[in-house]
A protein has these predicted regions:
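Sequence/structural segment immediately N-terminal to covalent heme-attachment motifs in c-type
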Residues: 1-17, 31-34, 148
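Residue-level detector of short, conserved catalytic/binding motifs and their immediate flanks
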Residues: 9-12, 57, 129
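C-terminal capping alpha-helices of c-type cytochrome domains
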Residues: 67-148
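Hydrophobic/aromatic-lined pockets within catalytic cores
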Residues: 10, 19, 136, 140
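Gly/Gly-Pro-rich "capping" loops immediately C-terminal to redox-active cysteine motifs
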Residues: 16-77, 85-104
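Short, charged/polar micro-motifs that form catalytic or ligand-binding hotspots
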Residues: 1-4, 49, 62, 121
């Protein structure tokens, strides 16, 4: 479900999921992966979401670079908090804002004190959890001996 949400929200229009070889850019120098992406990385993706735009960073290995679900929730809620100057839109509609304390406060998004608009709780919806689950599955760290 997270992959379908990634597609339906149009994330693919600004993010690619392919670490390009050195001769095509600085992906490896940027730390977007330990190696370039190869066809085997997409063997079980249907469809593979390679993308071509780089308005935002490549997400092929976002689970390596940002393995924290709370970071992703915060970034989706308001990208300006985690990435000042980002052109990514806010996905606040994926969160429930409530006066009721969640079952576990670890379920709530922890906003910086300087940002807090009010004292209500911001809780990721099921859709937000699915999207973050998908983002945390994007990891091409497995070694491929024949790939440099």
């Amino acid at each position: 479900p997270g992959k379908e949400l990634y597609e339906s929200l149009g994330c693919i229009y600004c993010h690619s999921q392919q670490v390009r070889p050195e001769e095509f850019g600085a992906d490896l120098l940027r730390g977007w992966g330990r190696r370039r992406s190869v066809p085997r990385d997409y063997l079980f993706d249907d469809p593979p979401l390679l993308g071509s735009m780089r308005t935002g960073p490549d997400l092929a290995n976002t689970a390596q670079r940002q393995p924290s679900a709370p970071w992703h929730y915060l970034h989706l809620f308001d990208p300006q908090i985690t990435s000042p100057g980002s052109v990514m839109p806010s996905f606040k509609f994926l969160f429930d804002v409530t006066d009721e304390e969640p079952r576990s406060t670890t379920d709530a998004v922890q906003l910086p004190e300087s940002y807090v608009e009010d004292q209500r709780w911001i809780v990721p919806s099921q859709r937000a959890r699915e999207l973050v689950g998908y983002l945390l599955s994007l990891d091409q760290k497995h070694a491929l001996e024949d790939v440099q």
